[in-house]
Regions:
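N-terminal accessory scaffold of Fe(II)-dependent oxygenases
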Residues: 1-204, 214-278, 282
Length: 285
């Protein structure tokens, strides 16, 4: 039923090191991180983050979580979220996309998540995902290359290329424009083109910006996803919808600072690509 993703033993072996073009599994890819020298990784996170306030997603049911239909966001101490997750209490608490670079962390703590690629590519995010049987709806990242690193527990990823399946998306002006409307977990996967991979502790998965993916954790799970700037944005020519989403996101984010916006290289790249796309379309037409 499921397609298989190619696997490697080292991130240095993948053929698209500087600009991801398809996902790859790196077995044991993140075991070089210092965090794996800790005997109790859960206690490590509790010790270093317990007093930090985190924006926590609150769900009443797993079905809500499968569609990333967040019922409430609560800013609360990590210690409170930690206790909810470890006991499997309801409502379900979930920390997702929490960038540790934005937290009040000692620089030495960040060293626990150093990845082999960090010396050759610009790492601009260290994202924490922490939950118990947590799920995430199918979505794309639109920009940057992502590497999902499974730190604790096990996680299953369902992933497919942008045009692989005729599924509905939210509108480009929606706050969920990078998500599918369909609950991927409740669809008949035998009728779809889907790659499936199970990540164990120490495994990594590379994710290009335009690949749809949904995740399901098995029991308590901690993932650290690292994001890397791309040197090429040409993929946007094949994905004009993503181009518009990025353009709108950047404009909304920097609307009050047009000068800064004009200096934003991704903004300039998108403008140039939009012009090229329109000219190419008119010429070919």
């Amino acid at each position: 039923m499921y397609l298989k993703i190619d696997e490697f033993n080292s991130i240095d072996e993948i053929p698209d090191y500087y600009n991801f073009t398809r996902p790859y599994v790196i077995r044991g890819g993140c075991k070089s991180m210092k965090i794996f020298s800790e005997k109790d990784k859960l206690q490590f996170f509790y010790k270093h983050l317990s007093k930090n306030e985190f924006n926590t997603e609150i769900y009443n049911t797993f079905t809500e979580m499968e569609s990333t239909d967040v019922k409430n966001y609560v800013s609360q101490p990590f210690s409170k979220t930690y206790n909810n997750i470890l006991t499997g209490s309801i409502p379900h608490n979930y920390i997702a996309d929490m960038d540790l670079l934005d937290c009040d962390m000692h620089s030495k703590l960040k060293e626990y998540f150093t990845y082999n690629m960090d010396t050759k590519r610009s790492n601009n995010g260290i994202l924490l995902f922490f939950g118990n049987n947590s799920r995430s709806g199918a979505h794309i990242h639109t920009g940057n290359d992502y590497i999902l690193n499974q730190i604790y527990g096990k996680k299953t990823i369902y992933i497919f290329d942008f045009y692989d399946n005729p599924l509905q998306t939210f509108g480009i002006f929606s706050d969920r424009s990078n998500f599918l409307k369909d609950n991927i977990f409740q669809l008949d996967h035998s009728k779809l083109k889907i790659y499936k991979v199970v990540l164990n502790e120490g495994d990594s998965l590379t994710i290009p910006p335009w690949w749809w993916h949904a995740a399901r954790a098995h029991d308590v799970s901690i993932s650290i996803t690292k994001t890397y700037a791309r040197t090429s944005q040409l993929y946007l020519l094949k994905h004009p919808g993503i181009m518009l989403i990025l353009f709108i996101e950047i404009c909304e984010h920097y609307l009050d600072d047009l000068f800064y916006l004009s200096q934003h290289k991704e903004f300039i790249a998108i403008i140039i690509l939009i012009i090229i796309y329109i000219v190419s379309y008119l010429y070919l037409k």
